[in-house]
Design a protein with these regions (language model features):
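Residues in soluble alpha-helical coiled-coils and helical-bundle/repeat scaffolds
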Residues: 11-14, 100, 104, 171, ...
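Hydrophobic helical membrane-anchoring modules
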Residues: 181-319
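Solvent-exposed polar/charged
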Residues: 57-60, 85, 111, 115, ...
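Short, hydrophobic secondary-structure boundary micro-motifs
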Residues: 35-36, 120-122, 152-155, 179, ...
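Acceptor/aglycone-binding surface of glycosyltransferases and processive sugar-polymer synthases
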Residues: 70-72, 76-86, 102-183, 199-218
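Structured catalytic core of nucleotide-sugar glycosyltransferases
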Residues: 1-129
Length: 319
């Protein structure tokens, strides 16, 4: 069988050579035994350092190295979609370009695939993570699994192996706003989860900071359910009920006050501020959904290819 290793890159010039050497060594060791052939597909997601030049050098030295360069940074989700679309292996394994996904896991994932699993997922431990990072991650999974239409498992990373059948299902979904962790779960198929210890980044800095993590979390929650909209409706009815009770309470005070009734100025101001804030939050939630619809109806491509050594990708590229 042929295995494709899919790696998305963004400014990874400091670690790319080390990553390629480690993964290539592992694949070469499997060649002729577990594998009949392999390819390593690099997606350069708009790097502005020497990442692409290094990829070109690797491709000149080894015809098993394939690459696609985007015209700008389209994001990891688009990079993985492009890789799935143009990879030619019987199965495709997604790995990080910084060696946080250990290459020694490749044979374990391949063995699970040969056992009949269409999806093999890596689940990392949280050993060594910062308290803030691990707390945020656990909070995200707690909230998402109570609001989303799919179940996400804490620790499941982008380290995945998909069969050709699973890949075809994945790329058949045309939505522009993609949340891969949810899409992997949505397509279903027989899955095996392999736990592993996440390695430290070998060089360079992470491109997925707190802000991107927050945006990614919001993207996931918005993409896979409409419950925030229902919460707005439910809270609206609750507020209506409370308002009716408050009016009834004030009416009783007026009736039994015998002319000494004085309206609550501070209560009124507090209520106005409270409900104004709630309205702004709900308008923001509506805006998020409307914004997603806005991007969906444009039907823009998920990515634009600037350069590639894959013939089919050349044919599909603009210009």
């Amino acid at each position: 069988m042929k295995l494709s290793i899919l790696i998305t890159l963004l400014n990874e010039e400091l670690v790319l050579a080390q990553t390629h050497a480690a993964i290539s060594a592992q694949l070469e060791d499997m060649l002729g035994k577990d594998l009949s052939d392999y390819e390593i597909l690099y997606i350069d997601d708009g790097s502005n350092d020497k990442t692409f030049e290094l990829i070109e050098e690797l491709a000149r030295d080894n015809d098993r190295v394939k690459y696609i360069r985007f015209s700008r940074n389209f994001g990891r989700e688009s990079g993985i979609l492009a890789g799935f679309k143009y990879a030619t292996g019987d199965a495709v394994m997604v790995m990080d370009g910084d060696l946080q996904h250990p290459p020694y896991l490749i044979p374990l994932f391949l063995e699970a695939y040969k056992e009949g699993y269409d999806v093999v997922s890596g689940q990392r431990t949280r050993d060594g993570e910062s308290f803030v990072g691990s707390t945020f991650a656990r909070l995200f999974y707690f909230l998402s699994n109570r609001s989303m239409d799919v179940h996400l498992t804490d620790g499941k990373s982008e380290l995945r192996l998909l069969s050709r059948k699973a890949i075809n299902a994945f790329i058949s979904m045309p939505e522009y706003n993609r949340f891969n962790k949810g899409l992997y779960e949505w397509i279903g198929f027989k899955e095996k989860v392999i736990p592993y210890k996440n390695e430290l980044r070998k060089a360079g800095k992470s491109k997925f900071g707190f802000k991107k993590s927050m945006n990614y979390a919001i993207q996931g929650i918005i993409s896979f359910n409409d419950r925030p909209l229902r919460v707005c409706i439910q809270f609206g009815f609750i507020c209506l009920g409370l308002a009716i009770l408050y009016l009834f309470f004030e009416l009783m005070k007026y009736i039994f006050s015998q002319g000494d009734y004085v309206s609550g100025y501070f209560t009124t101001i507090a209520a106005i501020i409270l409900f104004s804030g709630v309205q702004l939050i709900f308008i923001g939630i509506l805006g998020e959904y409307i914004g997603k619809i806005y991007y969906e109806v444009k039907r823009r491509p998920h990515f634009i290819i600037e350069d590639t050594n894959i013939e089919k990708a050349k044919e599909d590229s603009i210009g």
